[in-house]
Structure formats: C-alpha cells, structure tokens
C-alpha cells in the first residue's frame, strides 16, 4: 500500500482558512479588534510580555482584512478571544507551511528571517532616528532641492511637519486616542494652522480602499517583514480610524524623510541627503576624541586612487575605515531571500561600499607601519538592516584579515560612547563583535544597542516656529509629555 505524501502548504494556502474564519465577522469589528489588540500590546512595558502576544501576527490579520472587500464579511462582532483564535491559527499554520523550507540560506539570513518581524515589538524605543531628521534640516539651506522635495511631499514646512509629528510620536505607545479628542485637535489646529494640520493628516491617514490596493500584490515574504503597515499607520473607513500600534507609527515618522527621498527618484535630493547623513556620521565619529580623516585626508595620506572611503580612524592598535550609505529597512528590501538576491538589492549601496573600503585597505597595507595592524571595514547605514555577519555578501579573499561589519548609525554612536577619551580603540574589535552577536543571537534586542540621544521639549524648541501661538504650544507640550525627564 502506497502512502500519500502530504506536502506543506504555500503561504497563500496557509492563510486562506484564517481569512475565511475572519470573514465570519463584521468587517469593522475585525479591524477594531486588531487595532485594539496592538494598542493594548504597546501598553505592556516589558518586551517579553509584548512578544508573548504575537503582535506581528495581529498586524498580518489587519493586512489580510484590509486586502479584502468589506462586503465579503458577515455581521457577528469579533471579540478579542476570536482574534486570538485567528492569531494562533495563523501562527501554527505558518509553522507547518513551506515558507521555512528554502534551502541554502546562511545562518545569519535564516536568523534574520525568523526574527525580523518580531524586532520592532521588542526594541527599546529611543528617539535617535527622529532626532536625526531635525539635525538633517539644520544642514539644509532654504532653497535646497532636498528641502523642496520633502516639503512638496508633506505639504508644509518640514520643521512644522516634525513639530506635529512629535506629538503623535510621544502619544503612540500610550494615549494615541487623546490626539483625536476635539480639544486636542482644536489646540493642534490653533498652534499650527488648519492648512498644516490637513496636510499632516494626509501623510498619516490612508483611506481603506487605497491601503487595500497597495497591499494587493504579495508573496510569502510578507510574513517575515517588519512593520508591514508602516506606510499606513492610520487607516480610515466610513469616518472611523484604525491605528496599528506604536512600532508602525514610529517607523513611518522616524524615516519619513529618507523614505520620501528614496521614492522621489530625484538624484540631486538623494545626494544632498547622503551628504547630510555623511556629515552627521563624521561629527559622531569625532566625538570619540580620536583623529578622524575624511575622504580628502585619506586620499592624500595613503595616495588612494579610485574608490575611497568616507572616513578613517587611526589608533595605535587598529585602523578603521568607514563608508556611509543611506539604507534602511523598507518593504522593497526582502526579509527572506537568497544571497544572490540580496547582492542585487545591495549592488549600489553595500557592495559598492565594500569595494570602496577594500580599495582603501589595500592602499593602507602598502604603508609599512600598517602592515601588521588590523583593519576594520565598517559600512554605516541610516537604519539597522539586521544582516548579522556579512561574509556571505563579501566573500573576498581578504575577508578573514579585514572583516566587514554593517552597523546602523545608532550602533555606531553606541560604540563611540564606549570609546570616549579614556578608553583605547584596542577594545573596538570586541565591541564590533558584540554588535554582530547582537544581530545573530539576540536580535530581539533584550540588551538593545540603541540611540544615545533623548529629545524632549529641548529639541522641540530648536525647530519651533516663532510665529506659532506660544500658549497653545506650551499646552500641547504638557499634554503630550514633552517635558519628560531628559534621561527618559
């Protein structure tokens, strides 16, 4: 007797019974249940408590509902227990599906695939990425092409956008509903003007049919993506707003400018953004107290011809070369893919950076005093790509001698703090290895490497428009908790 072989189901096959189960309920109640579940999850302080609720699966429930037409749903009200049943069914179904059966992925990429969707719900929530946008604006002239691209997209002065966004950022984890109370909305409108507020709401609120159309095309990579709804932090249907939790809103706001630049396809604006980010990175490195060579310095000192790195730090025990790239997590970057696909995606960023760093390293090694010193090649990215060890991307023959590390600017700033004057760079290798280990083993960030900077009303005052109503602004600051202790 021949036994039939039961083949694992595909992603679409796996989620179909979950979607059928969801369709037994009223459409609004499904969206409400998912939204409330994510809001309640945000209120849990400990990351382990948040993780235990599988909030990233609840996000997928919302995505699948938004992809459906409301007419496909019935009339029973979905309870939180009903939602949990859908979450568990999806979790268990995916566990047994074929989405895990892609062979040949290096261990770091497999770990990334397993954990990437969970990370936003387990990270410490600092405001470093938000603060960098303020710093970026301070570097731009009023007629900058980059400023024009950003402001054309948001429909207001970029500083005003960040002012308004900060109040939502502060309310995202606890009290997001307060922002839409009539008194709060009235105060916002008085402070910033009705035109600015209308423009801002257009950037964060998306009609259901628009979100559904954008989500129409999908594959199994959807299951592994972080913040699948970051483009639509609020969705509107028949006058009701649905909110998908703090991680989605934070991601939307913190990377607003870099996303705008990436989608605009404007070479001048893109270059201006990269120049500003490069300058910011250089200033962060100089905080270490060690001499920092910029590209011109590196070319002169080591007679570098061809591709060159942005920065170099030289110490008695090590040489570190840095290349800065404006790259961060987004939906066009696969969460689960082959090495070759990642190489294609990173051809103009990470792989190009590696070529620049390798060329500099080869020139440095020609100088006798550097022959036996370790050279660390570091690619600094705008956001954390969570790629773990990078040898699968850069399998060049010098890999063992000159390891390549991909660090976000947040991680780099954490390292800079660790090597402030009084600490030698002899320990840098261990610090870099810690970052790699953090990605590979503890990507849930139980010991987060996060931004060192906090911004409160101090940063708000930096971008505050003096033409705004000061009394209204002070009222908003007190309502939003903008006067929190700077150690927060």
PLM region spans:
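Catalytic cores of nucleic-acid endonucleases
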Residues: 326-378
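Active-site beta-strand-loop-beta-strand hairpin of nuclease catalytic cores
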Residues: 313-333
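Active-site-proximal structural scaffolding
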Residues: 274, 278, 304, 315, ...
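Extended, hydrophobic alpha-helical segments in both membrane/secreted and soluble proteins
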Residues: 281, 307-311, 322
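A short acidic/basic microdomain associated with nuclease active sites
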Residues: 286-307, 311-314
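Hydrophobic/aromatic beta-strand patches that form the interior of the parallel beta-sheet core
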Residues: 320-322, 378-380, 405
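Short acidic, S/G/P-rich loop/turn micro-motifs used as interaction or catalytic elements
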Residues: 328-329, 384-387
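Acidic, metal-dependent phosphodiester-chemistry machinery of nucleic-acid enzymes
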Residues: 1-275, 279, 283-288, 316, ...
């Amino acid at each position: 007797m021949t036994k039939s072989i039961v083949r694992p189901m595909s992603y679409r096959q796996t989620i179909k019974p979950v979607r059928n189960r969801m369709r037994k309920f009223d459409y609004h109640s499904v969206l409400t249940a998912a939204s409330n579940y994510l809001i309640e999850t945000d209120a849990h302080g400990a990351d382990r408590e948040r993780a235990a609720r599988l909030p990233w699966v609840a996000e997928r429930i919302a995505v699948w509902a938004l992809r459906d037409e409301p007419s496909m749903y019935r009339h029973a009200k979905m309870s939180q227990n009903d939602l949990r049943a859908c979450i568990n069914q999806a979790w268990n179904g995916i566990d047994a599906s074929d989405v895990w059966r892609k062979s040949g992925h290096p261990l770091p990429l497999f770990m990334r695939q397993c954990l990437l969707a969970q990370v936003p719900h387990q990270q410490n929530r600092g405001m470093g990425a938000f603060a960098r946008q303020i710093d970026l604006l301070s570097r731009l002239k009023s007629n900058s092409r980059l400023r024009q691209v950003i402001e054309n997209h948001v429909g207001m002065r970029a500083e005003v956008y960040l002012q308004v966004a900060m109040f939502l950022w502060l309310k995202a984890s606890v009290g997001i509903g307060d922002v839409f109370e009539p008194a709060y909305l009235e105060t916002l409108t008085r402070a910033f003007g009705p035109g600015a507020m209308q423009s801002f709401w257009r950037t964060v609120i998306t009609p259901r049919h628009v979100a559904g159309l954008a989500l129409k095309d999908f594959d199994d990579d959807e299951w592994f993506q972080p913040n699948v709804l970051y483009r639509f932090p609020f969705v509107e249907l028949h006058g009701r707003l649905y909110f998908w939790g703090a991680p989605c809103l934070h991601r939307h706001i913190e990377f607003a400018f870099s996303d705008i630049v990436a989608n605009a396809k404007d070479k001048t604006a893109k270059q201006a953004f990269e120049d500003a980010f490069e300058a910011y990175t250089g200033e962060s490195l100089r905080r270490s107290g060690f001499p920092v060579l910029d590209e011109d310095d590196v070319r002169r000192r080591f007679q570098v011809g061809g591709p060159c790195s942005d920065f170099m730090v030289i110490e008695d025990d090590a040489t570190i070369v840095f290349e800065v790239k404006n790259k961060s997590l987004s939906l066009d970057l696969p969460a689960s893919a082959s090495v070759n696909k990642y190489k294609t995606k990173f051809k103009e960023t990470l792989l190009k950076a590696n070529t620049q760093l390798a060329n500099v390293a080869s020139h440095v090694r020609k100088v006798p005093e550097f022959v036996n010193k370790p050279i660390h090649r570091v690619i600094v990215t705008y956001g954390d790509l969570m790629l773990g060890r990078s040898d699968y991307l850069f399998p060049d023959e010098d890999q063992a001698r000159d390891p390549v590390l991909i660090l976000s600017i947040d991680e780099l700033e954490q390292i800079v703090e660790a090597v402030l004057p009084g600490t030698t760079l002899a320990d840098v290798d261990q610090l870099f290895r810690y970052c790699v280990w953090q990605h590979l083993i503890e990507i849930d960030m139980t010991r987060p490497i996060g931004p060192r900077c906090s911004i409160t009303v101090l940063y708000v005052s930096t971008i505050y428009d003096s033409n705004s109503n000061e009394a209204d602004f002070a009222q908003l600051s007190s309502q939003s908790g903008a006067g929190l202790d700077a150690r927060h």
